[in-house]
Amino acid sequence: MVDTEIWLRLMSISSLYGDDMVRIAHWVAKQSHIDAVVLQQTGLTLRQAQRFLSFPRKSIESSLCWLEQPNHHLIPADSEFYPPQLLATTDYPGALFVEGELHALHSFQLAVVGSRAHSWYGERWGRLFCETLATRGVTITSGLARGIDGVAHKAALQVNGVSIAVLGNGLNTIHPRRHARLAASLLEQGGALVSEFPLDVPPLAYNFPRRNRIISGLSKGVLVVEAALRSGSLVTARCALEQGREVFALPGPIGNPGSEGPHWLIKQGAILVTEPEEILENLQFGLHWLPDAPENSFYSPDQQDVALPFPELLANVGDEVTPVDVVAERAGQPVPEVVTQLLELELAGWIAAVPGGYVRLRRACHVRRTNVFV
């Protein structure tokens, strides 16, 4: 039995991973005859041995055909191409299917996870964080799911960065289907698709906790953008803590269900971050970072000669959507006058018009010189 076939059969045993899989693969490769009795000598149960032997020949042949295609790889844990960051975890996958560039797996990665039903706030700040980090050389790793995962991947690609997607199913299909084009773009820009599951395995619910440990295991840290208290993103954060990774949490508006997860993590000791540089400072990895150009900064420069337009009005526009009539009522000004001032604030980059009203974009560094509440 050739080595590749041994790994394919072992990968079909869902309860097998890590050192045990590597040890068994090496042992089986030395045997001249394989049956259930022989396999049980390695420590496999009878059921696991039967699973190994019954893995369909058709699946093996289709997997071998898949591996013949360009940039399609099967990476055992004893391979020089296996990511060392993941290998250092206690429950690392015994082997990985990878489509794309193998060197991406060895890059400096930050996992970015969050809610599938994200808010406007989560999308905006998740995108800004990922764009900035990607331009600074960080590979953005996530799960290709709807919501924040997709936002993270797209943001990295938008600035010509590199992104890695770890799937909870086999690489023969992309889930969700709406992200097929996103997956293709990710590969075109030097990223990779990764899975520990046989190629034809569907996206079953119990696959995703296993997927989450790979997302965190590949990365130096995990950024949670938005998440409910009962969320797979918190599973990823827990995996990160167990693996000795840093966990970063982006705070959100009080009352937003998506803020509950990050706020809970912060209470448990996660690092609260309000700008990407705070992540870079916590994850120093030897690169010579280029300073941000002033025009790319999220916040206004703290200079006395920069005038803050209409501070009384700006104080009444928050991070959540605020209708125009509410702003006018709070400011005690006529609606037509408020509309004119809001337009000027929008042109200056302080707020943005969204369906239903306006939202704040930048923190006023002039808060010490005005009564603007930030």
From Swiss-Prot:
- Please provide the Gene Ontology terms (biological process) for this protein: DNA-mediated transformation
Show the Gene3D superfamilies listed in the entry: 3.40.50.450, Winged helix-like DNA-binding domain superfamily/Winged helix DNA-binding domain (1.10.10.10)
InterPro entries per record? DprA (IPR003488), DprA_WH (IPR041614), WH-like_DNA-bd_sf (IPR036388)
- Effect of a null allele: No visible effect on transformation or growth in the presence or absence of mitomycin C (in strain KA797), on plasmid conjugation (in strain PC4020), on nucleotide excision repair, survival of UV damage or DNA recombination.
Q: So what does this one do?
A: Partially complements natural chromosomal DNA transformation defect of an H.influenzae dprA disruption mutant. May help load RecA onto ssDNA.
Q: Which family does it belong to?
A: Belongs to the DprA/Smf family.
Name under which the protein is recorded: Protein Smf
The species this protein belongs to is Escherichia coli (strain K12)
Source gene? smf
